[in-house]
Amino acid sequence: MTNLRKTHPLMKIINHSFIDLPAPSNISAWWNFGSLLGICLVIQILTGLFLAMHYTSDTLTAFSSVAHICRDVNYGWLIRNLHANGASMFFMCLFLHVGRGIYYGSYLYKETWNIGVILLLTVMATAFVGYVLPWGQMSFWGATVITNLLSAIPYIGTTLAEWIWGGFAVDKATLTRFFAFHFILPFIITALVVVHLLFLHETGSNNPSGINPDSDKIPFHPYYTIKDALGLMLLLLVLLSLALFSPDLLGDPDNFSPANPLNTPPHIKPEWYFLFAYAILRSIPNKLGGVLALLASILILLIIPFLHTANQRSMMFRPISQTLFWILTANLITLTWIGGQPVEQPFIIIGQLASILYFMLILVLMPLAGMFENYMLEPKW
């Protein structure tokens, strides 16, 4: 009798993707984040769907509707806390996933990598428009500051900003369209995830050594399904701990006040996962320059495959590149800290130095380290 799992048109796709998929035998826990991101996406879509059933995207009632969800809807407080902290978990997994890709040279699968960068940008856009929806002080002023950056574009900037706003400032029209974007984007992300996996399964997974693993493959199920299940339990443990014990730990107290266009908060700052980019934006005293640096800080990921100079794929056996990678990690943590600080000395100069170092590491130092390591492997003396 033929196995339905291997013959049915739909089951066959699932089988080739999650069950009989040949996977390298040595992939570490750093390869768990892909599945965790998929789970985060499902959690966000489900909690978001239930929130959307009770939310109203009107400037007069948006803030009250969120309070109503937390007070009057059955387990509304839990759904809201899971959704808000789920976003933080999503970005934590995203950053670790991208970091893994850089460390182990996964970016050499160019199609998979490029779709991944597009996914990162789409998730960032989704999180930004989502943060505006509760219509608190930081929601309103965050939206005002970030959308205002469009006006830095020469000639068309102001028109573009007003087009996004649907008026002359962030108002009812802006909130309504941001809700529409926030609802549709996760489904676009889901479609992109399918394409991301499609390209990944064309080549198969990379592995920590960076060496072709074809000589030693094992089936995805049961080995990596059980490993992913462990990752899932740890993810849920952290998410539930956050949502149940300290749901407002990563939020901003200003967002407990309804949006007031006449009262600017003392320190306007985005959620923690955007602070590194915000610090780079603020470190340049010119508006257009700051916007370009902000874009470059993310889009630089697209050119990483072309900056790979080493003869080895992974950093596993490249100590100089490893050192630079961990300096880059520390630098990003520094930028995140600076992004949350007021614009005054010494934070300004620290932010500027960290921003310069960020681009220097990726564009100059890491490619040079790769070339030097090649030389050390085959010295000419």
Swiss-Prot record:
Nucleotide-binding keyword on record: no
Q: How is the cofactor bound?
A: Binds 2 heme b groups non-covalently.
Q: Does the keyword Lipoprotein apply?
A: no
* Superkingdom of origin: Eukaryota
Annotated residues for binding of a ubiquinone: 201
Q: What subcellular locations does the record give?
A: Mitochondrion inner membrane
Residues annotated to bind heme b b562: 83, 182
* SUPFAM superfamilies associated with the record: a domain/subunit of cytochrome bc1 complex (Ubiquinol-cytochrome c reductase), Transmembrane di-heme cytochromes
Q: How would you summarize the oligomeric state and partners of this protein?
A: The cytochrome bc1 complex contains 11 subunits: 3 respiratory subunits (MT-CYB, CYC1 and UQCRFS1), 2 core proteins (UQCRC1 and UQCRC2) and 6 low-molecular weight proteins (UQCRH/QCR6, UQCRB/QCR7, UQCRQ/QCR8, UQCR10/QCR9, UQCR11/QCR10 and a cleavage product of UQCRFS1). This cytochrome bc1 complex then forms a dimer.
Q: Return the PANTHER family for the record.
A: CYTOCHROME B (PTHR19271:SF16)
- Further notes on this entry? Heme 1 (or BL or b562) is low-potential and absorbs at about 562 nm, and heme 2 (or BH or b566) is high-potential and absorbs at about 566 nm.
Protein name (Swiss-Prot/TrEMBL): Cytochrome b
GN (gene name):
MT-CYB
